[in-house]
Amino acid sequence: MNWWIEEYKKYHREQNDYGNGGALKFHKRHIDDLIFDTKAETLLDFGCGKGDVYEVNDWHWPTPTLYDPAIPEHDELPNGSFHGVLSTDVMEHIPEDQIPEIIDQIFSRAERFVYLGIANNEAQAVLSDGTNAHVT
């Protein structure tokens, strides 16, 4: 297991409000357009966190398959492809040496579109060793 996945498992356990998908709302209209324009019927949320955002909001989207290696309920990366793969507030948490593998995992599952929402600032979250959670 990668050290960073273990760090995020721990962080999710300790911080109840962390990983609730709040960043997704800032990207919604762009994702709405992609879903509409590509007529996407199947979605994968890669790095979904706890996935709570889908329980609270009515997105008018096909219900996405949820994947997040730090969340036991969603930690199995699905095989196969999806019309669209979205990943918001994820890539900046991936160590640089792991990025090619993660990009491959995302793009190899996308048939019609990929949407990456990537923060370019420091995170509020700090890992147990004092490292800022936005490691890339």
Task: Describe each region flagged by the PLM.
Residues 84-90:
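A short beta-strand submotif of the Rossmann-like class I SAM-dependent methyltransferase core
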Residues 112-115:
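Short glycine-centered segments of the SAM/dcSAM-binding site in methyltransferase folds
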